[in-house]
Amino acid sequence: MTVKKAYGAITRFFRAYSLPESSEYTLISDNLYLIKQRIGGVRTKNDKAEKLRLERCLRREGYVFSTESLISFYTSHGWTLKTAEVYRLSDNICTLLVCAVAEECDRFMKNGRGSTLRMRSAIESLRRLPELEINEVFSALCPTETLFMKVKGFADGDDATRDVYREALIRCARRRREDECVLLSRMT
């Protein structure tokens, strides 16, 4: 389900649900602006493998998101992320959480029942999404980060400086069609 379709399902539920005093309706009405705000900044790319990994992680945690649970899930499976994938991480998580809310809205409209807990957990995770510690994710899941720490300007720099280094690596690796780790190890 795309973000646009998910938001459409949520708004249809909001407009058509016949029990405005129900907890599900109140939950959606209280958080509709938050959902729309999170969707507005999402730039999606069709990376199905990465979305499947994230969905497994979110399902395991009961759609309660935290940076620590994400890192522990990925490290337990031995998965790593490229630099660009870490930057897209919050957008992919947002997409999956909004789709989870939309699926529950569809269930409520079709069957008259669904998982209020899943809906509530996904919305709370959407609230906490800006708290995603990108630097922690980089240091734990991105192998290029350890190579970058050897570079003098990167290790001493602030977040903006580190982002400049990371974005330059992404562009250079795409241009040369090489792996980021191989390219960075040759450059340092």
Q: What are these model-predicted stretches?
A:
Residues 2-188:
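Basic, amphipathic N-terminal segments
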